Amino acid sequence: LANGPMREEIEREGGLKLIYIDPPFAVGADFGFDIEIGGEKAEKRQTVIEEIAYRDTWERGMSSYLSMLYDRIKLMHSLLAEGGSIYVHCDWRVNNAVKLLLDEVFGSSNFQREIVWRIGWISGYKSAAPNWIRNHDNIYYYTKGTNFTFNKEYIPYPAGYTRRDGAVPEGAGYPIEDTWNCSELDKLDSIQIMSFSGEKVGYPTQKNENLLARIIRASSKEGDLVADFFGGSGTTAAVAEKLGRKWITCDLGRFGIHTTRKRMIGVQRELKAAGKDYRAFEVLNLGKYERQFFMDNMVNGARKKKENAYLSLILQAYHAQPVESFKHLHGRKAGRMVHVGPLDVPVTKQRVLEIFEECKTKLITKVDVLGFEFEMGLMPNVFDELREQGVDMVAKYIPKDVFDPRAVEKGQVKFFDVAYLDAKAHVTKRKVKIELVDFVTKYTQDDLEDVEKQLKKGAKVVIENGRIVKLNKDKDGFVERTVLTESWQDWVDYWAIDFNYRDKKEVIRVPQP
């Protein structure tokens, strides 16, 4: 977005016409989420990169938060079209400081309104504050210049409404003010308060669609490009698609991206069923750009130097000791040899067989094979065959966390065994039926024995070795284990099939500056 093909595409569209952001404004915000299996909930904790990103955001309190936000808002300002609008959603913890920041970037003369959004009817512990009950967020509305789009919104008059003189009122209704959800006619309650809303997707900071629809209708036109750079559950994208706008949404959290993707597929189906047009969308992963750092300029002596730096980095993150005098083996850890796969291509069957031959020659029986990607078909058949021939090979993914030096230094990088899907093809004449047989994962987040020791009384759900297990400890210290993942299908949230798949590389050419 700062400088590349995506920015060029935005500029070709004439720039962003509308930006809505709801940046994190609570210390301790994270990317964890709940997985529901068999009526029980297990927490899927955030990745190392996600955890560090928010830890850094609040490392020095408000100053580090504003530093993070300032850089991003400056970039958003540069991507915004002349006459474009931005809405920044925040609350009492940061609103004064954020407004000063927006004045700095956009200019105080381009401040249009401070919208006060009453969150909704509250009860229970939320109503037990020692003084006035806090019940609103702030949304700051700025524009880039004075020639901006604004489509005035109205609340329709109630059915049967007449003026004092008995006349039927003219016009579309009451013009909407800068205080929202403050009357029976203006219903914009928080999605968190509307407990039975069908919109809910289980995301902790989700905003309701009516709130975003009001903003998008007012400050953009059909076909305009709308963006949300703290995408969360994808509400902005979902509403923009329904209202005929083009959209871009970004998020650091994997669950946010997954939730948005799933939600947008649902929006497409909804629009298709209604006979309305909808657009295809793409999920772009920035994870490979860290790898690009090591691949750039790998020529002559620089190539060898970077290869050595890459091997050293991966071995350090894996807590392995480097070894020499081997062709395909690079390290040793806990009685197992370690092979570090290439940076720019998948680990292939040919490479695995070469590792196997060297192990047989050197009388080595245990190897961990680390890689960013693996050739299709390696798991489980090839590894099972080599295990039967005397070499126990385990394939593990190299996570993108390895490119964050803070995560490596703190020993927080985790390498997970490669998960794989087992499928069978049934061919009948000119028809092919694909049967999904199994999904094999050894994903581990907890240690059952450790959790049992620490659990004083009650229940806890843990994830270990591809299983979700509920532990229940009674007052006498007896622990009952219940496996909640009875079927491999319990791990699958949804399936997606690319019917237009083509087995060829997508090439994006970027002109040299």
Region spans (language model):
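Accessory, often C-terminal, charged low-complexity segments
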Residues: 3-13, 17, 77, 92, ...
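Extended, hydrophobic alpha-helical segments in both membrane/secreted and soluble proteins
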Residues: 16-26, 65, 69-73, 86, ...
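Short active-site oxyanion
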Residues: 84-86, 366
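Active-site-adjacent bridging/hinge elements
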Residues: 42-51, 181-192, 230-240
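A short glycine-rich, Lys/Arg-flanked "PGG" loop and its adjoining helix->strand segment in the class I
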Residues: 70-82, 361
